[in-house]
Amino acid sequence: AGDPDAGQKVFLKCAACHKIGPGAKNGVGPSLNGVANRKAGQAEGFAYSDANKNSGLTWDEATFKEYITAPQKKVPGTKMTFPGLPNEADRDNIWAYLSQFKADGSK
């Protein structure tokens, strides 16, 4: 199990494109509120790549961690340019952080 506080620090690598928490809106990337167990390509109002929309993925813990290890490898054609998180502890911690947020941005 990851550490949400450590995950918040890891999220700084993501925050240029993604927002989370109360009032978070889509930016360069979709808002990540409620990402846990959401189907890929479903954040309201975000223009996803066809690759992401049609991936058939659901963001459970295992799928998210596999994706964030190397996004372009997991979903070829994704618009996400982030190279990935090679460190397993970082992946555990960011999932612990992100998965605590509900769709409305509350914890």
Swiss-Prot record:
Keywords: Electron transport, Heme, Iron, Metal-binding, Photosynthesis, Transport. GO terms for molecular function: electron transfer activity; heme binding; metal ion binding. Heme c binds at C14, C17, H18, M80. Binds 1 heme c group covalently per subunit. GO terms for biological process: photosynthesis. InterPro entries: Cyt_c-like_dom, Cyt_c-like_dom_sf, Cyt_c_1A/1B. PROSITE patterns: CYTC. Pfam families: Cytochrom_C. Cytochrome c2 is found mainly in purple, non-sulfur, photosynthetic bacteria where it functions as the electron donor to the oxidized bacteriochlorophyll in the photophosphorylation pathway. However, it may also have a role in the respiratory chain and is found in some non-photosynthetic bacteria. Belongs to the cytochrome c family. This is Cytochrome c2.
